[in-house]
Amino acid sequence: MTAADTMELGVWLLGERAGTLGLKNGRLRFRYEARWLQKPGATPLSQSLPLLAEPFEDQACRPFFAGLLPEGELRRRIAAQCQISYANDFGLLAVIGGDCAGAVSLEPGDPATAVAAVEWLEPDQLIALLAELPQRPMLAQRDGLRLSLAGAQ
């Protein structure tokens, strides 16, 4: 796989890099990081993705990763807002995977190197953001914005 024809997202579990999700020719592929596999007490992402050094191909890993995304109308609205196909699991994970429900997150880079900042809002700014929600579900594509998606399935 070359960088030119493969896209990758880091897969993080409880803040530690557990593996890499790749996309090549429309097919997903997940591989655990060697460091994660050697970690005492390492936890698999799922029973369907046991701790193995071999990569998991599309059929084995897609159900787990697609299951991290919102479903139904919310998914359609996020896809439309981000101008991504509703069926593009990888594309949606690349945009909102940093805010998956649960302990797993997906990032194109290392979130530890990102500079986290808090932007305190005035009441009128908060009202404006809330007004955006019907057109911009979960404020998708808002630069640097991170939310908790717990329960947003």
Q: Predicted regions: what is each one?
A:
Residues M1-Q153:
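Phosphate/dinucleotide-binding and metal-coordinating scaffold of catalytic cores
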